[in-house]
């Protein structure tokens, strides 16, 4: 790809759908390292059943909370308390939050973010197809605000459509 910001190490993982679980897990680590994030998780959902869960989570070290969820659950009610999730369900463009503590309350529920995730800055990257939400990639940092650079944004936006086949394959294998 010309002008691609995706590192070459991403390509073999993005090219497989036979083993989507391990590929997605490994990709989170690569994304986390590339963006110098503290944590990177992947929320997956089946848009037909509206069942979702945080299926994968990479943490820079053991001091960072791992938020992986074991059970799939209906996710529509999350949108009532989380405007970021509501935006994802609408398939709005991805949202880059530089500081949760001063973000617009119409965009970020600061109390919900602090209580549920504890991060300070995040990317809420929506994996969509048409008007359907298939997942959310969420790199974040904890102790300080973070200005997300144009190169960070380009990497995320280039990666999202490439993740979709893996996400769909994982959901098919896991939920049928």
Regions found by a protein language model. Give the residues of each.
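Short regulatory alpha-helical segment in sensory/regulatory domains of signaling proteins that mediates
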Residues: 11-15, 27-36, 42-46, 89, ...
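Soluble sensory domains of the PAS superfamily and closely related sensory modules
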Residues: 86-95, 102-105
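GAF sensory/regulatory domain recognition
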Residues: 41-76
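Regulatory loop-to-helix N-cap segments in sensory/regulatory domains
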Residues: 141-159, 167-175
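Sensory-domain boundary capping and coupling elements
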Residues: 85, 127-142
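Signal-transducing coupling segments at domain and membrane junctions
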Residues: 98-121
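Signal-transmission linkers at sensory-effector interfaces
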Residues: 1-25, 33, 54, 169-176
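A short, aliphatic-rich beta-strand micro-motif
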Residues: 120-128
């Amino acid at each position: 790809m010309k002008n691609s910001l995706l590192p070459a190490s991403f390509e073999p993982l993005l090219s497989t759908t036979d083993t989507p679980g391990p590929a997605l897990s490994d990709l989170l680590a690569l994304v986390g390292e590339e963006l110098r994030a503290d944590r990177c998780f992947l929320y997956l959902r089946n848009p037909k059943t509206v069942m979702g869960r945080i299926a994968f989570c990479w943490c820079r070290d053991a001091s960072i909370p791992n938020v992986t969820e074991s059970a799939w659950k209906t996710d529509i009610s999350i949108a009532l308390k989380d405007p970021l999730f509501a935006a994802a369900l609408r398939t709005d463009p991805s949202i880059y939050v530089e500081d949760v503590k001063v973000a617009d309350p119409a965009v970020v529920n600061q109390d919900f973010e602090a209580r549920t995730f504890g991060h300070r800055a995040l990317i809420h990257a929506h994996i969509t197809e048409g008007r359907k939400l298939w997942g959310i990639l969420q790199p974040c940092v904890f102790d300080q605000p973070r200005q997300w650079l144009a190169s960070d944004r380009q990497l995320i936006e280039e990666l999202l459509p490439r993740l979709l086949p893996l996400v769909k394959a994982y959901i098919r294998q896991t939920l049928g």
